[in-house]
């Protein structure tokens, strides 16, 4: 279980700052894939009509987890940076701190 606080004081690369400032932490989420990207247009054109599946469908998935990517936004200049963490099964943002002698809860 990885628990990350919602704010973090870290270095800001923005032109205004270039020093340690408070950052707001959120988890990165991939955007919706565009229908008009060149690869998608080519794929849709190839798929249309008769002939079934034209490209291989990937089945041999090897990984069970994804790396967690944090999005850090500077409170002062609003510059955004990304920071990747190690792989983990359980990720929590701004959860309660651990107490000594407590049982683990998921």
Curated annotation (Swiss-Prot):
One of its GO terms (biological process) is response to cycloheximide. One of its GO terms (cellular component) is ribosome. The keyword Ribosomal protein applies. Keywords: Antibiotic resistance, Cycloheximide resistance, Ribonucleoprotein, Ribosomal protein. One of its GO terms (molecular function) is structural constituent of ribosome. Pfam families: Ribosomal_L44. It comes from the Eukaryota. InterPro entries: Ribosomal_eL44, Ribosomal_LSU_eL42, Ribosomal_zn-bd. Gene3D superfamilies: 3.10.450.80. The keyword Ribosomal protein applies. Confers resistance to cycloheximide, an inhibitor of polypeptide elongation. Belongs to the eukaryotic ribosomal protein eL42 family. This is Large ribosomal subunit protein eL42. It comes from Meyerozyma guilliermondii (strain ATCC 6260 / CBS 566 / DSM 6381 / JCM 1539 / NBRC 10279 / NRRL Y-324). The lineage of its organism: Eukaryota, Fungi, Dikarya, Ascomycota, Saccharomycotina.
């Amino acid at each position: 279980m990885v628990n990350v606080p919602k704010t973090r004081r870290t270095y800001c690369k923005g032109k205004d700052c270039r020093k340690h400032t408070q950052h707001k932490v959120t988890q990165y989420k991939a955007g919706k894939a565009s229908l008009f990207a060149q690869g998608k247009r080519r794929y849709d054109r190839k798929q249309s009509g008769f002939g079934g599946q034209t490209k291989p469908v990937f089945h041999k998935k090897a990984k069970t987890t994804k790396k967690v990517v944090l999005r850090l936004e500077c409170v002062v200049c609003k510059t955004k940076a990304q920071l990747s963490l190690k792989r983990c099964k359980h990720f929590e943002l701004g959860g309660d701190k651990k107490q000594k002698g407590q049982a683990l809860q998921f």
